[in-house]
Swiss-Prot record:
It comes from the Bacteria. This is UPF0223 protein BcerKBAB4_3787. Gene3D superfamilies: BH2638-like (1.10.220.80). Belongs to the UPF0223 family. InterPro entries: BH2638-like_sf (IPR023324), UPF0223 (IPR007920). NCBIfam families: PRK04387.1. Pfam families: UPF0223.
Length: 89
């Protein structure tokens, strides 16, 4: 995409890579769909890096402003979808 992902420059390179993979998965949910287990695994790693709800909301807002995609709505949809199913928005 032609925009800059919201990143915290205090994160390690490994953490940045994990967060970017999560952002890419959110994009794929809107564009094609992603297997629920894969998305939730990336979300769990994201939550290890960003454990605070306030920080998650801030990142979601920034991500939505640049991409048009909502992390919150995507994860809510994933929680509604059965195991081994595709999450699609």
């Amino acid at each position: 995409m032609e925009y800059q992902y919201p990143l915290d420059y205090n994160w390690s390179n490994e953490e940045m890579v994990a967060v970017v993979k999560f952002y890419e998965a959110i994009e794929k949910v809107y564009e094609k769909g992603v297997l629920r287990e894969d998305l939730m695994e990336l979300y769990r790693r994201f939550k290890e890096i960003v454990p605070s709800k306030a920080a998650e909301k801030k990142i979601d807002k920034e991500f939505q402003e640049v991409s048009g995609y909502s992390i919150y709505r995507t994860i809510q949809r994933a929680k509604e979808v059965a195991e081994k199913k595709i999450v699609k928005m």
